[in-house]
């Protein structure tokens, strides 16, 4: 039924070498596949096996989605066999109208790869229409004077069928006067005419009736009949004559309706009524009669409607001129319509990909489309283009067919979709154009790894946090879509190994929130680092890592711990012995405490809560040093007790207490007989209550206090100045031991810690100083020489040298040298007031020495001075010895039983006397005994 390029391709031996390349070049190398079918085929009739003619197997029909497309779809493809089937009624006369060659053009589309083939179906005419006369009754007139051979034109019948199925012949019934002649024009049209065979006699027969039959060439033939009535009239011997037998004119299709088109003219040599000519359309299609109008008197032809070259290119009509005597003649009028560029091109999308992967290579076909312009010639030639700033371009695959292909890399994250506007422009003057926009969606692939908001994270978490609390949150973003952009978080590494990371922290896979699995302890874990990973769910998965450093902040959760004084092995408290001759400022002992916290939470301060003799001792706020605030008086007990509180700097502060037992004696033998008779000291809480009662009583006797004050003022005026000086409030005692001038200074080789039971019945008697101390702060002496000074001013110091007691400065053997000072470098002067350490190194040095001092004080193994119970520091606890876990404390180093501070032992080994503070040092000539 039809030929195909595929069949010819298989026939060529050389083309077999390139079976895979032929589908790409098929549209340009082969002629269209042609089929020929008769019209009016039933629906479902097989036109041909399109798959076979394309060289496709039965499996390829569905796999490659073989289909056809056209403006009016009259055909379809069987999805199983690949047959081209009739889908709708095919009427050649309706589809092609008056065209003799009727063809339907289709496009066969296949995918994988995407391609298109041209198919032409020729519609063959069948004899489905019978001839038809415009008028069933034909009336003619003829003069009786008409000679034999006169011809009368008859209206021909019409048949929409073509070729052999069109009108083939005409017949009339037999009669003696007329015969039928068929005239064939140059275009093949057949026109019947009656020929007069013999003269007429109107008087004999005034009219003649004939039957005209039109036959087509079909098998079987179809026919139509018309009744002819001929009236015989009087003589009119000259018929009209046209100036031309054929009129031809060309008109623009843009000619407005009502415009004059053509005027036909005919002349008649007769006179009178026989010369009056009227014009009529004859043998003209009804569509032509609707398009044009003819003035019967003038012969002027005008258009009733606008022309459209795309619908009808040429009009043909016959005009008859008839005179008043009934004679007539005909002429042919041909009107050709000239094409104007009045139709814009059309863009028809035949195939379009729904989505394009963003990793599609350049040259991938994403759409097929064709153009159509109903104009003719250059007006119908179309060229297409698109925007130049998009990664696509157009290829012309064949006449009026185009491919839209990729021309660069696609990135969905930057441009998720493209609105491609195709512009088609014809070559007319002026050119006309049209556009068609299509939307191309870019499908996502997993080409972007997650990205964290920060390059690293640092969070601060206070210790003792509740387990399960969130401590941080990391966030990452992924511009991909769906699973490619869905992020999960996890912990992949940490510096807690080999500890179980999961027992410390966890992370929410969905939100990135980091939770603490336990309460952190700053003293055990101050900081740790985690490596978090963000991973998407694409295939393959992509990930990114980020570091998270967690700093555990300190809280005041550890109370101070007193290292000295400590209880003995039997639970009894140690006693510190104080010489009876101790002057104000004498260093009695030192409270040493540590705090496991850090920072301000470990900044310790020392306070006296209770004292058996208030005002006798002073306590350094930061150093914890216990010094004599005044000289021992006659009424002061030999045994003294101090209750000291150690507070840290936290909020709220935590504290610890320590009890100091002090004994005034010059040697141990002096106090041993009386220790058993010493009454037991009252309970600290009871004494505190007692003082509260006394304070309340004092408030009630304010008047009595006023009297006492008046008596005191009177006594001041009556007593000698020397006696009053003991009560002078301006007395300042030099810090450090006061030694009478008949003694020489030197280092003590021994010191004592005396433990005395509470059942003693005796106590040491010391000389009490009547000078009260008006400050409970640390005593700092700057000018006092350690003796009673009259209140007359500094000039008495030079005028009465015999009243001054010379006192050597403290022995520097017990002081730190500059190189041995803990903390900062030796060139920097330390702060003697207990200020906070400047750096971690200072803290570690002090912590090491404090622990060493405390350890030796506890076990009585002091090596400094050689005496048992001395909390001295040996050379191994110098500044180079560090302990990382001991908290920071400065100045809390004390040597019990001594009024000296640490010194460099090197000077002692070299036999050099330490330099005194004021140059009045005497060499010791005596050796102290225990």
Swiss-Prot record:
CDD domains: Cadherin_repeat. Residues 31-133, 134-242, 243-347, 348-452, 453-562, 570-675 form the Cadherin domain. Residues 1-30 form the signal peptide. It is found in: Cell membrane. Residues 791-839, 900-930 are annotated as: Disordered. Keywords: Calcium, Cell adhesion, Cell membrane, Glycoprotein, Membrane, Repeat, Signal, Transmembrane, Transmembrane helix. It is a single-pass type I membrane protein. Residues 31-691 are extracellular. GO terms for biological process: homophilic cell adhesion via plasma membrane adhesion molecules; nervous system development. Residues 920-930 have a biased composition (Basic residues). Disulfide bonds: none annotated. SUPFAM superfamilies: Cadherin-like. It comes from the Eukaryota. GO terms for cellular component: plasma membrane. Residues 800-839 have a biased composition (Polar residues). This is Protocadherin gamma-B6. It comes from Pan troglodytes (Chimpanzee). The lineage of its organism: Eukaryota, Metazoa, Chordata, Craniata, Vertebrata. The gene is PCDHGB6.
């Amino acid at each position: 039924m039809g030929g195909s390029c595929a069949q010819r391709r298989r026939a060529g031996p050389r083309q077999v070498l390139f079976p895979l390349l032929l589908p790409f070049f098929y549209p340009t190398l082969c002629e269209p596949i042609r089929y020929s079918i008769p019209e009016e085929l039933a629906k479902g009739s097989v036109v041909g096996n399109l798959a076979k003619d394309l060289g496709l197997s039965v499996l390829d029909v569905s796999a490659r989605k073989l289909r056809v497309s056209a403006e009016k779809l009259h055909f379809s493809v069987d999805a199983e066999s690949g047959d081209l089937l009739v889908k709708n009624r095919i009427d050649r006369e309706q589809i092609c109208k008056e065209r003799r060659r009727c063809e339907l053009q289709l496009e066969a589309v296949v995918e994988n790869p995407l391609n298109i083939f041209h198919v032409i179906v020729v519609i063959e005419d069948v004899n489905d229409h019978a001839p038809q006369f415009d008028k069933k009754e034909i009336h003619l007139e003829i003069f009786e004077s008409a000679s034999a051979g006169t011809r009368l034109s008859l209206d021909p019948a019409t048949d929409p069928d073509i070729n052999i199925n069109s009108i083939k012949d005409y017949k009339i019934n037999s009669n003696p006067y007329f015969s039928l002649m068929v005239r064939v024009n140059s275009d093949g049209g057949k026109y019947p005419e009656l020929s007069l065979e013999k003269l007429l006699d109107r008087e004999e027969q005034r009219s003649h009736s004939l039957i005209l039959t039109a036959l087509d060439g079909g098998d079987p033939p179809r026919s139509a009949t018309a009744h002819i009535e001929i009236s015989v009239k009087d003589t009119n011997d000259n018929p009209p004559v046209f100036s031309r037998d054929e009129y031809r004119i060309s008109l623009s299709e843009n000619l407005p309706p009502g415009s004059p088109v053509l005027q036909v003219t005919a002349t008649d040599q007769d006179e009178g009524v026989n010369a009056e000519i009227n014009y009529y359309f004859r043998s003209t299609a009804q569509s032509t009669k609707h398009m044009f109008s003819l003035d019967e008197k003038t012969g002027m032809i005008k258009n009733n409607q606008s022309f459209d070259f795309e619908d009808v290119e040429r009009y043909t009509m016959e005009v008859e001129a008839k005179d008043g005597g009934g004679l007539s003649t005909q002429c042919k009028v041909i009107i050709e319509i000239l094409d104007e560029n009045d139709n814009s091109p059309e863009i028809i999308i035949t195939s379009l990909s729904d989505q394009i992967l963003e990793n599609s290579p350049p040259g991938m076909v994403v759409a097929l489309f064709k153009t159509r312009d109903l104009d003719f010639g250059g007006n119908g030639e179309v060229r297409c283009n698109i925007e130049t700033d998009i990664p696509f371009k157009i290829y012309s695959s064949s006449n009026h067919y185009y491919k839209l292909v990729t021309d660069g890399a696609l990135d969905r994250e930057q441009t998720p979709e493209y609105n491609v506007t195709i512009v088609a422009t014809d070559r007319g003057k002026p050119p006309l154009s049209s556009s068609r926009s299509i939307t191309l969606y870019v499908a996502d692939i997993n080409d972007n790894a997650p990205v964290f908001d920060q390059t690293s994270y640092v969070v601060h978490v206070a210790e003792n946090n509740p387990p399960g609390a969130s401590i941080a949150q990391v966030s990452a973003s992924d511009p991909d879509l769906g699973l490619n952009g869905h992020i999960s978080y996890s912990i992949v590494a940490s510096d807690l190994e080999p500890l179980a990371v999961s027992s410390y922290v966890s992370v929410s896979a969905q939100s990135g929130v980091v939770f603490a699995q336990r309460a952190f302890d700053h003293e055990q874990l101050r900081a740790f680092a985690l490596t978090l990973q963000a991973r998407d769910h694409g295939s393959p998965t992509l990930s990114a890592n980020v570091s998270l450093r967690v700093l555990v902040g300190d809280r005041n959760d550890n109370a101070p711990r007193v290292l000295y004084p400590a209880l003995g092995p039997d639970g009894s408290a140690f006693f510190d012995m104080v010489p009876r001759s101790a002057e104000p400022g004498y260093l009695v002992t030192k409270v040493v405490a540590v705090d496991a916290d850090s920072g301000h939470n470990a900044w310790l301060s020392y306070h006296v809560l209770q004292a058996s003799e208030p005002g006798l001792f002073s306590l350094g706020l930061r150093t914890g040093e216990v010094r004599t605030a005044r000289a021992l008086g006659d009424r002061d007990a030999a045994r003294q007790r101090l209750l000291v509180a150690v507070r840290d700097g936290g909020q709220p502060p935590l504290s610890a207490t320590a009890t100091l037992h002090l004994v005034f004696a010059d040697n141990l033998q002096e106090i041993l007989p009386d220790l058993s008779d010493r009454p037991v000291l009252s309970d600290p809480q009871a004494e505190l209550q007692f003082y509260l009662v006394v304070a309340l009583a004092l408030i009630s006797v304010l008047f009595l206090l006023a009297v006492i004050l008046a008596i005191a003022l009177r006594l001041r005026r009556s007593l000698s100045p020397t006696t009053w000086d003991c009560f002078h409030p301006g007395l300042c005692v030099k810090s450090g031991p006061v030694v009478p001038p008949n003694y020489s200074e030197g280092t003590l080789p021994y010191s004592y810690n005396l433990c005395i039971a509470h059942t003693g019945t005796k106590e040491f008697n010391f000389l009490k100083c009547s000078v009260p101390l008006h400050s409970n702060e640390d005593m700092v002496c700057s000018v006092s020489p350690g003796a009673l000074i009259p209140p007359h001013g500094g000039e008495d110091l030079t005028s009465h040298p015999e009243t001054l007691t010379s006192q050597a400065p403290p022995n520097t053997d017990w002081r730190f040298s500059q190189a041995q000072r803990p903390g900062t470098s030796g060139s920097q002067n330390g702060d003697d007031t207990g200020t906070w350490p400047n750096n971690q190194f200072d803290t570690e040095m002090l912590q090491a020495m404090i622990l060493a001092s405390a350890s030796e004080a506890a076990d009585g193994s002091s090596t400094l001075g050689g005496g048992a119970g001395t909390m001295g520091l040996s050379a191994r606890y110098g500044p180079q010895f560090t302990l990382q876990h001991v908290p920071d404390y400065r100045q809390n180093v004390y040597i019990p039983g001594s009024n000296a501070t640490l010194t460099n032992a090197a000077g002692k080994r070299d036999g050099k006397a330490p330099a005194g503070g004021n140059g009045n040092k005497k060499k010791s000539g005596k050796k102290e005994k225990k």
